[in-house]
């Protein structure tokens, strides 16, 4: 039986309107891009996202939900990051080209579909899956490469271990399809940060939380989703993350695997702190590509400790760039030839050489 899908989000409705009123701004002017998008979403929901839970459970873990509802959450979050739902005179979505809306939405649809095959390296399956689900759409090879790269860049590592997937996968930051320019790195950053900020209570697997034998690493991820309350402030350029934690959870110790096959102990508040640090790194990374368009200046997090439905303590923290900045590499480390002695030896005569002339 087909999965129920919705295409009613503001971002999806923006695509529908653009196809109807600005058909000339798409590679093909046949007005079918929204229909193609809808059919691809249905296909992905039925064949891939309907089985991600079972596929992920094969390793024994109980991950947070990766079904089509998570895809809709990422679409909703991306819309909020672009200014939908905010009282702004200059929302970022107005600066998107019509075809960019299509590429962004399609990349979001693809970003987690590979989990139906295997969690490790799932992002690398984007191109293969797009080929399979978009056979009847007429997308050309260049469209396939651009859109699948945007989807793939939402996570993972490059072969050299680098997490800078956006730069590595999109050598050309603004490729074009004919006369249509696509801000590929910008779109990839939107997908990546929207995915990071789409944790919410609907992703939590409460059966896994209550079931005996659920691995602690899965419990932590599900508790995190269950207790987080996110809010995107487009006008204030801030991300707000509140965590309402029951006092009974504070002393509990969880055992999580380490890379050497051993385990280490961690408490839930410390796990939240680690996740916040990762979220802040993602914000700073994605801001490189979102600057001047839809960047965010800070994450404002807050712990609310609850006992018998009564708030007994609040701990706020702001994550943002403060103080005088440092450089990870010097100019000479970035470019060894930016060196006085090297350039002198390469282009200038020594005193002895001048005397010999």
Question: What do the predicted segments below correspond to?
Answer:
Residues 2-121:
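Acidic/His-rich, divalent-metal-binding segments that scaffold phosphate/diphosphate chemistry
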Residues 54-58, 142-148, 158, 225, ...:
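Extended interaction regions within the primary functional domain
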Residues 68-72, 141, 187, 269, ...:
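Generic detection of long, well-ordered alpha-helical segments
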Residues 2-22, 37-41, 211-357:
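C-terminal effector/catalytic modules and regulatory tails appended to multi-domain proteins
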Residues 76-83, 128, 149, 274, ...:
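A broad, structural surface signal
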Residues 51, 55, 59, 154, ...:
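Short secondary-structure junctions and interdomain/linker hinges
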Residues 92-237:
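Divalent metal-dependent catalytic cores for phosphoryl transfer on phosphate-bearing substrates
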